[in-house]
Regions:
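Short secondary-structure transition hinges
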Residues: 86-124, 131-134
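All-alpha amphipathic helical-bundle segments outside canonical DNA-binding/catalytic cores
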Residues: 75-76, 113-116, 130-148, 165-169, ...
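C-terminal peripheral helix-coil segments that are non-catalytic and often amphipathic
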Residues: 124-128, 132, 161-186
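Short, basic, alpha-helical segments at the C-terminal edge of helix-turn-helix-like DNA-binding modules
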Residues: 54-61
Length: 186
């Protein structure tokens, strides 16, 4: 495994344990390397976090591609694409991202940009479902706005934690709510 990849993976683990409060000293200690070595790959903690976001969305994209090219039904594909998150991100308490925009504004912008992009495969699935008469016609812009707002809300409040839900459980519940508004017959 490359040093850069080890830094990313350890950052994910530290974030899982401490949220945004982990330090580069802790990261270096966990990796058994010097901070200077980390700085050879990343100029700052914010740069590392940006790469963690990029890495996560690359993994999400790979999962989505596998789902979209599978033999699943259109309904099942849409359900799975909407909740696609990398395995190593499943245990993360995403409420730890609350306040991200104040501390690491560039990372927050990057995360938001990813939430707002690459909706074409989802739109195509919904349109396919409409053509197959398993989904009722819906305004795709409103669907995107609803889902994006929910994703952002999940990440920006402590409501999931206080209700005992993980991010993945909340996504699954959101998908159930959305799908029962779309599905004609299952």
């Amino acid at each position: 495994m490359l040093v850069e990849e080890k830094i990313i993976n350890q950052t994910i683990q530290l974030f899982q344990a401490k949220g945004l409060k982990f330090t580069l000293d802790e990261l270096a200690s966990e990796l058994r390397i010097s901070k200077k070595t980390i700085y050879q790959y990343f100029p700052s903690k914010e740069a590392i976090l940006n790469e963690v976001v990029e890495y996560g969305f690359r993994r999400i994209q790979a999962k989505k591609t596998a789902i979209l090219t599978s033999e699943l039904t259109t309904i099942e594909k849409l359900k799975r694409v909407l909740i696609a998150i990398p395995n190593q991100y499943e245990q993360i308490d995403f409420s730890s991202l609350k306040g991200l925009e104040k501390i690491y504004p560039q990372v927050a912008k990057n995360l938001q940009a990813h939430f707002e992009s690459d909706w074409e495969p989802i739109f195509a699935l919904v349109e396919q479902g409409i053509d197959e008469e398993v989904f009722r016609p819906v305004n795709l812009v409103v669907l995107k706005m609803t889902l994006t707002a929910a994703f952002n809300y999940f990440l920006s409040t402590n409501d999931l934690e206080s209700s005992g839900l993980t991010y993945r459980e909340a996504l699954q519940e959101l998908v159930e709510v959305v799908m029962h508004g779309l599905v004609i017959n299952e």
